Amino acid sequence: MQGTSKDNGGRHPLYRGVRQRKNSNKWVSEIREPRKPNRIWLGTFSTPEMAAIAYDVAALALKGSQAELNFPNSVSSLPAPTSMSPADIQAAAASAAAAFGAARDAIVMANNNSQTSGVACMNSSYDNTNMNGFMDEDLVFDMPNVLMNMAEGMLLSPPRPTVFDAAYDADGFPGGDDYLWNFP
């Protein structure tokens, strides 16, 4: 495969923490825990960029600002794990890689659509049957945290009700519906 060699064990020449599986087009990522012999398996991915993003999330969680990242300009958009447990780091890394893959697919699909839009407008028999690709908008628009945010909202106490005065109706007008029929 281009970009790897047998001499370096399948490691990617550009991305840290990424290597290619033997006899496969899949890329894997793992990271060693600081000051421990343990490794955290981050997953198997279809592209080296997805594996590199997963590595970045884990490196940032484990090493903080001292981490050497593959994509240092994307630090602000990377998800942070909920805790320092390997399972949470794996989940955050997988989420970031999936979001990167979905965003990449959306960009490729948009580019393909813009290139064919001129032809499609001229061809009246064109239909959208070639649009069979799936794009997970939840990952593209950072929606995995929506349920957690909604749950946090449920923990808030509701606003206090205002004191209801019997002389005023719900709209704040005196005398209920009498204001409709009071003419000077």
From Swiss-Prot:
<dbReference type="InterPro" id="IPR036955">
    <property type="entry name" value="AP2/ERF_dom_sf"/>
</dbReference>
<comment type="similarity">
    <text>Belongs to the AP2/ERF transcription factor family. ERF subfamily.</text>
</comment>
<keyword id="KW-0539">Nucleus</keyword>
<protein>
    <recommendedName>
        <fullName>Ethylene-responsive transcription factor ERF024</fullName>
    </recommendedName>
</protein>
<dbReference type="Pfam" id="PF00847">
    <property type="entry name" value="AP2"/>
</dbReference>
<keyword id="KW-0805">Transcription regulation</keyword>
<dbReference type="GO" id="GO:0050832">
    <property type="term" value="P:defense response to fungus"/>
</dbReference>
<feature type="region of interest" description="Disordered">
    <location>
        <begin position="1"/>
        <end position="21"/>
    </location>
</feature>
<keyword id="KW-0238">DNA-binding</keyword>
<dbReference type="GO" id="GO:0003677">
    <property type="term" value="F:DNA binding"/>
</dbReference>
<keyword id="KW-0010">Activator</keyword>
<dbReference type="GO" id="GO:0005634">
    <property type="term" value="C:nucleus"/>
</dbReference>
<dbReference type="InterPro" id="IPR016177">
    <property type="entry name" value="DNA-bd_dom_sf"/>
</dbReference>
<keyword id="KW-0804">Transcription</keyword>
<dbReference type="GO" id="GO:0003700">
    <property type="term" value="F:DNA-binding transcription factor activity"/>
</dbReference>
<dbReference type="GO" id="GO:0009873">
    <property type="term" value="P:ethylene-activated signaling pathway"/>
</dbReference>
<dbReference type="InterPro" id="IPR001471">
    <property type="entry name" value="AP2/ERF_dom"/>
</dbReference>
<dbReference type="InterPro" id="IPR045277">
    <property type="entry name" value="DRE1A-I"/>
</dbReference>
<feature type="DNA-binding region" description="AP2/ERF">
    <location>
        <begin position="14"/>
        <end position="72"/>
    </location>
</feature>
<keyword id="KW-0936">Ethylene signaling pathway</keyword>
<comment type="function">
    <text>Probably acts as a transcriptional activator. Binds to the GCC-box pathogenesis-related promoter element. May be involved in the regulation of gene expression by stress factors and by components of stress signal transduction pathways.</text>
</comment>
